[in-house]
From Swiss-Prot:
InterPro entries: Trp_synth_b_CS, Trp_synth_beta, Trp_synth_beta/beta-like, TrpB-like_PALP, TrpB-like_PALP_sf. PANTHER family: TRYPTOPHAN SYNTHASE, TRYPTOPHAN SYNTHASE-RELATED. PROSITE patterns: TRP_SYNTHASE_BETA. It comes from Pseudomonas putida (strain GB-1). Its EC number is 4.2.1.20. This is Tryptophan synthase beta chain. It catalyses: (1S,2R)-1-C-(indol-3-yl)glycerol 3-phosphate + L-serine = D-glyceraldehyde 3-phosphate + L-tryptophan + H2O. Pathway: Amino-acid biosynthesis; L-tryptophan biosynthesis; L-tryptophan from chorismate: step 5/5. The beta subunit is responsible for the synthesis of L-tryptophan from indole and L-serine. Keywords: Amino-acid biosynthesis, Aromatic amino acid biosynthesis, Lyase, Pyridoxal phosphate, Tryptophan biosynthesis. Its cofactor is pyridoxal 5'-phosphate. The lineage of its organism: Bacteria, Pseudomonadati, Pseudomonadota, Gammaproteobacteria, Pseudomonadales. GO terms for cellular component: cytoplasm.
C-alpha cells in the first residue's frame, strides 16, 4: 500500500476500498446522484468557497486555537500534549463546521426545508442554528432515550425554532433517529435537504462531511508548524460515526511519520455486549446507505450500542474509517466509560476545561499513551466538544458511585 493510496477516495461509486457506496431506496437514488453532482459543482465554485470561508471565520469563529495542555503534559510526564479546541466553535463542538457547509449547499440547490438526526444533540443544535441563520424550517429526529439524557440540548434546539420528533423505535438512540430521518427524506424528496451529521450515510455524504470537517486538520498542520516548526508525531480523536476524527486525520494520512489513533467507545468493555466499538467488536455489513463495520448478532441483525456518551452511541462507523482500519493506516482502540470519566475529571482539574464525554475518550487514550513517550513527542488531541451537555450524566454517575461507596 503506497502512501498516496491512503487518500484516494471515494471512487465514482462512493467506495473506499470495499466500504461506502449508495445502498438506498430507488426513490432516493436520483436524489443522492443529484446531491453528488451539486456538491462537485459547489467545490469548484470560487463563490461558494468564498461564502463558506466567510461563515467559517465570522460565524463559527475559526481558526480556533491549538493549545498546549501544559499541566496535563506535566501530569503525564511524557509527550507534549496539544488540544485542537473545537469546543470553542459557535455551538460548542465540531458539528457546525459541517452544518454550515451543508446549509450553503441546500440553499444553492433551492431546498426549502432541513431535516437531521441527532444523538448527543450537538448536531441537532448546529443544524437548528444554521436553519435559523438562513430562515429555513427544520425538523430534528432524536431518539427518546437521548432526549431523556440531553434535556439542555433539546431546549436549545426548541429555542432556535426547530421541531423535535422523538423516536421511540428500537433503543430510541441515534441509529433509530437516522432511520426515521431517512423515511422523512424519501417522503419529501423535492423540497427537503437531509443534513447528515457524520461521515456515514450514502455517497456523497461520507466524503462531503469529511471535506467540510477537514479544516480541523488543515488548521492543525499550520498551527503546529508555527509553534513547533514540524508535523505532529501522533493524532488522537474519538470515533462514533467519526467526523471529528476524519476532520483531523485526513490532512495527515499521507504523512508516514504521523501515527494516527481513533478511539472508539468501549462502554463496559469490548468483551461485553455493552459497547459501541464497531471496528474492535463488529463485522462488515450495510446500514444507513453504506457498507461499513457494524455491531451485529449471528443473524446479521444490528445490535444495540452502549456508551456513556450519547454522541458515540452508534452501532456503525464511517466507511472511510473502515477502510483505514483494513489498510492499517489508522490504529483504532477503545476506551471504557470509566476511563473516559477519569479523563473528564482530570482535564477539568488540570486544565480548567470541561470536555464533552465524547472528547474524554480521546483524552483518556492520550493520558494512557503520553507517559510512555519521549518529551519531544508532539501529540494532538481533538477536543471535539464542550461538556456542558453532559453535566446531568456525570452528576448521575457520581451519585451512583457515592451510593456504592
Amino acid at each position: 500500500m503506497t502512501q498516496s493510496q491512503y487518500r484516494p477516495g471515494p471512487d465514482a461509486n462512493g467506495l473506499f476500498g470495499s466500504f461506502g457506496g449508495r445502498y438506498v431506496a430507488e426513490t432516493l437514488m436520483p436524489l443522492v446522484l443529484d446531491l453528488a453532482r451539486e456538491y462537485e459543482a459547489a467545490k469548484a465554485d470560487p463563490k461558494f468557497l468564498e461564502e463558506l470561508a466567510y461563515f467559517q471565520r465570522d460565524y463559527i469563529g475559526r481558526p480556533n486555537p491549538l493549545y498546549f495542555a501544559e499541566r496535563l503534559t506535566e501530569h503525564c510526564g511524557g509527550a507534549k500534549i496539544f488540544f485542537k479546541r473545537e469546543e470553542l466553535n459557535h455551538t460548542g463542538a465540531h458539528k457546525v463546521n459541517n452544518c454550515i457547509g451543508q446549509v450553503l449547499l441546500a440553499k444553492r440547490m433551492g431546498k426549502k426545508r432541513l431535516i437531521a438526526e441527532t444523538g448527543a444533540g450537538m448536531h441537532g443544535v448546529a443544524t437548528a442554528t444554521v436553519a435559523a441563520r438562513f430562515g429555513l424550517p427544520c425538523v430534528i429526529y432524536m431518539g427518546a432515550t437521548d432526549i431523556e439524557r440531553q434535556q439542555a440540548n433539546v431546549f436549545r434546539m426548541k429555542l432556535l425554532g426547530a421541531e423535535i420528533v422523538p423516536v421511540t423505535a428500537g433503543t430510541g438512540t441515534l441509529k433509530d433517529a437516522m432511520n426515521e430521518a431517512l423515511r422523512d427524506w424519501v417522503t419529501n424528496v423535492e423540497d427537503t435537504f437531509y443534513l447528515i451529521g457524520t461521515v456515514a450515510g450514502p455517497h456523497p455524504y461520507p466524503a462531503m462531511v469529511r471535506d467540510f470537517q477537514s479544516i480541523i486538520g488543515k488548521e492543525t498542520r499550520a498551527q503546529l508548524q508555527e509553534k513547533e516548526g514540524r508535523l505532529p508525531d501522533s493524532l488522537v480523536a474519538c470515533v462514533g460515526g467519526g467526523s471529528n476524527a476524519m476532520g483531523l486525520f485526513h490532512e495527515f494520512l499521507e504523512e508516514p511519520s504521523v501515527q494516527i489513533i481513533g478511539v472508539e467507545a468501549g462502554g463496559h468493555g469490548v468483551h461485553t455486549d455493552k459497547h459501541a466499538a464497531s471496528l474492535n467488536g463488529g463485522v462488515p455489513g450495510v446500514l444507513h446507505g453504506n457498507r461499513t463495520y457494524l455491531l451485529q448478532d449471528a443473524d446479521g441483525q444490528i445490535t444495540d450500542a452502549h456508551s456513556i456518551s450519547a454522541g458515540l452511541d452508534y452501532p456503525g462507523i464511517g466507511p472511510e474509517h473502515a477502510y483505514l482500519h483494513e489498510v492499517k493506516r489508522v490504529e483504532y482502540v477503545s476506551i471504557t466509560d470509566d476511563e473516559a470519566l477519569d479523563a473528564f475529571h482530570a482535564t477539568c482539574r488540570l486544565e480548567g476545561i470541561i470536555p464533552a464525554l465524547e472528547s474524554s475518550h480521546a483524552l483518556a487514550e492520550a493520558i494512557k499513551r503520553a507517559p510512555k513517550l519521549p518529551k519531544d513527542h508532539l501529540m494532538v488531541v481533538c477536543l471535539s466538544g464542550r461538556g456542558d451537555k453532559d453535566m446531568q450524566t456525570v452528576m448521575n454517575h457520581m451519585a451512583a458511585q457515592e451510593k456504592q461507596a
